[in-house]
C-alpha cells in the first residue's frame, strides 16, 4: 500500500464543450495514447445523437446518461472470521463519476454496431433513456447491495 494517497490530478476542460467530465470520458475512451482518435469518436457520437434526436443537444444527452448510470451504492468484499461477505457501501462522488464513465465505455465497446462512434452514440442514448448494458450494470449493483443489506453493519 502507499504511504500516502496519490494526489488527484486536475484534467483540462475539453476545447469544444469546456467540460472536465468530457475530457475524462475521452481519456477513458482512448487506446494506446491516441487522444485525437478518441476525440473524433466522441464528437462524432454526439453528432450522431443530434441527428437521431433533432431537438436534443448531444452534450445534454451525454450528461443525462452519466447521471443515470452513476451508482449510489456498491458492494465490497470483507472477510469476517473465515467468511467473505459482500458488504454494501455508499460510493463517493468522484468514484460514482468514474464508474459511470467506465461502464458506458465498456458497454459501448461490447455492442455490435459498425463503428465505435455509432456504438457510443447508441449506448449514450440508451443510458439517457434508462436502458442498455451500462444502466443494467448499475441495476445489478443495486440488486447485489439490496440482497446483502443484512451485512451493512460490517461497513468500515
Swiss-Prot record:
- Check the record and name the InterPro entries matching this protein: Ribosomal_uS7, Ribosomal_uS7_bac/org-type, Ribosomal_uS7_CS, Ribosomal_uS7_dom, Ribosomal_uS7_dom_sf
The alphabetical list of record keywords is: Ribonucleoprotein, Ribosomal protein, RNA-binding, rRNA-binding, tRNA-binding
User: According to the lineage, what is the superkingdom?
Assistant: Bacteria
Ranges that cross the membrane: none
Listed GO MF terms:
rRNA binding; structural constituent of ribosome; tRNA binding
Query: Does this entry carry the keyword NAD?
Result: no
| Pfam family, any one | Ribosomal_S7
Tell me the Gene Ontology biological-process terms attached to this UniProt entry: translation
Does the keyword section mention RNA-binding?
yes
Q: One cellular component GO annotation, for this chain's record?
A: small ribosomal subunit
Per its database record, what is this protein's job? Answer: One of the primary rRNA binding proteins, it binds directly to 16S rRNA where it nucleates assembly of the head domain of the 30S subunit. Is located at the subunit interface close to the decoding center, probably blocks exit of the E-site tRNA.
Q: How does it assemble?
A: Part of the 30S ribosomal subunit. Contacts proteins S9 and S11.
Which family is it part of?
Belongs to the universal ribosomal protein uS7 family.
The name on file for this protein is: Small ribosomal subunit protein uS7
Please give the organism: Nitratiruptor sp. (strain SB155-2)
